[in-house]
């Protein structure tokens, strides 16, 4: 009996030792990451916000946030049950309240070595507190600003930033062609995001509309990682006060089988999926019918290259009662009013390359003011509620 008890005790000893070992603390070193870019906000909605920032060393990320100045809530991403460890950090805030101002602080904790057991960690780097305000389709007014076709010209971006009334602007829309093509992450920040965020800061959201040049270059396939949305795509809708915004991706300006693409483009099926989404959205989303104004934001005013032409897109926009389409691409201003002679029932405004468009909408009127970087008024447009 005694022998049996001794054998059982010895048998349980490794398990007890293992249990104690598992609770041993992991090592924390006196080193912390540096936040190199951001934080910035992408396409904030009524109940969601996407916060992005970057660090110089691999880290885990979280966001402390809350209504007003409260930062008691914590959002920490997970992918397949694992906390992401890297230098790019994306945190989605969900179940927010419309039209509410939130405070937030981003936290990055360095991961020194990702061992299988007891990974080595470091200290925190923080940025904040910052704040943002969610959109609200019930608000009686909204003001936002649009620019386009900056094409890696950082001096152009600086002039546009100076021409924007940031105090009155709730969010910034970039209508595409921020690049000639995209080679690297370094270029993406140097030529576009960094100078753009110098105006936006961490408190106002960026709404990005993909242009045809954003489909080009070795880093084009990574662009969505830097302007992510909860939808995980470049087309979606948002409600901003009395305006129902529909963001579309007009793809490329040439056919997929053009040799310059070397058979690496498949925009035809992509655009077919997008058109199916648009048709379903305008047919089923109540805000399309209820909103005082419906506005489409896209890059190419002719809807981009389409095998069967733009007919189905124009027809869908007409049937949905779209009031205004705003685009870029041509590098010069133009305006086409609705009418049977032009085949569309919406106003079409094409923004020039060195111009700023300011949209101010109430429940009764949508007004667009286009100015040059020198402040000179190029065009004003007033659209009454139908």
Q: Can you say where each PLM-predicted feature lies in the sequence?
A:
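Extended active-site neighborhood of metal-dependent phosphoesterases/phosphodiesterases
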Residues: 106-133, 186-283, 312-318, 324, ...
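Bacterial N-terminal signal peptides
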Residues: 5-15
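Conserved, compact domain cores that house catalytic/ligand-binding motifs in diverse enzymes
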Residues: 140-215
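Short, well-ordered beta-to-alpha junction loops that form the rim of enzyme active sites
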Residues: 107-108, 250, 297-301, 329
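Acidic, histidine-bearing metal-coordination/catalytic regions of metal-dependent phosphoesterases
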Residues: 2, 19-146, 166, 361-386
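Short acidic, glycine-rich surface-loop motifs adjacent to enzyme active sites
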Residues: 176-179, 282-305
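Divalent metal-coordination and catalytic microenvironments
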Residues: 53, 102, 149, 172, ...
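Active-site neighborhood of phospho(di)ester-bond hydrolases with catalytic His/Asp-centered motifs
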Residues: 145-148, 171-177, 204-212, 295-299, ...
């Amino acid at each position: 009996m005694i022998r049996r008890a001794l054998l059982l005790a010895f048998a349980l000893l490794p398990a007890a030792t293992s249990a104690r070992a598992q609770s041993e603390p992991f090592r924390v070193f006196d080193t912390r990451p540096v936040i190199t870019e951001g934080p910035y906000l992408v396409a904030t909605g009524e109940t969601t916000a996407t916060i992005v920032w970057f660090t110089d060393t691999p880290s885990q990320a979280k966001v402390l946030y809350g209504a007003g100045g409260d930062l008691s809530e914590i959002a920490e991403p997970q992918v397949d049950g694992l906390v992401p460890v890297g230098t790019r950090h994306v945190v989605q805030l969900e179940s927010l309240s419309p039209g509410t101002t939130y405070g937030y602080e981003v936290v990055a904790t360095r991961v020194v070595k990702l061992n299988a057991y007891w990974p080595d960690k470091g200290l925190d780097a923080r940025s904040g507190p910052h704040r943002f305000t969610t959109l609200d389709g019930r608000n009686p007014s909204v003001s936002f600003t649009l620019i386009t076709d900056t094409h890696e010209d950082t001096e152009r971006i600086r002039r546009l930033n100076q021409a924007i009334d940031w105090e009155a602007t709730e969010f910034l829309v970039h209508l595409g062609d921020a690049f000639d093509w995209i080679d690297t992450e370094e270029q993406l920040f140097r030529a576009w995001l960094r100078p753009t965020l110098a105006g936006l800061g961490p408190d106002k959201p960026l709404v990005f509309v993909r242009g045809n040049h954003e489909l080009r270059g070795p880093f084009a396939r990574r662009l969505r990682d830097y302007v992510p949305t909860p939808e995980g795509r470049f087309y979606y809708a948002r409600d901003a006060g009395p305006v129902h915004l529909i963001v579309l991706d007009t793809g490329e300006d040439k056919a997929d089988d053009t040799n310059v693409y070397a058979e690496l483009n498949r925009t035809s099926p992509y655009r077919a999926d997008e058109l199916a989404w648009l048709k379903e959205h305008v047919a089923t989303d109540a805000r399309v019918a209820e909103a005082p104004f419906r506005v489409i934001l896209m890059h190419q005013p002719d809807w981009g290259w389409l095998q069967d032409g733009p007919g189905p897109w124009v027809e869908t926009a007409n049937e949905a009662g779209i009031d205004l389409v705003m685009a870029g691409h041509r590098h010069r201003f133009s305006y086409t009013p609705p009418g049977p002679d032009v085949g569309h029932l919406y106003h079409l405004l094409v923004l020039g390359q060195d111009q700023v468009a300011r949209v101010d909408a109430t429940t009764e009127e949508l007004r667009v003011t286009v100015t040059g970087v020198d402040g000179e008024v190029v065009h004003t447009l007033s659209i009454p509620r139908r």
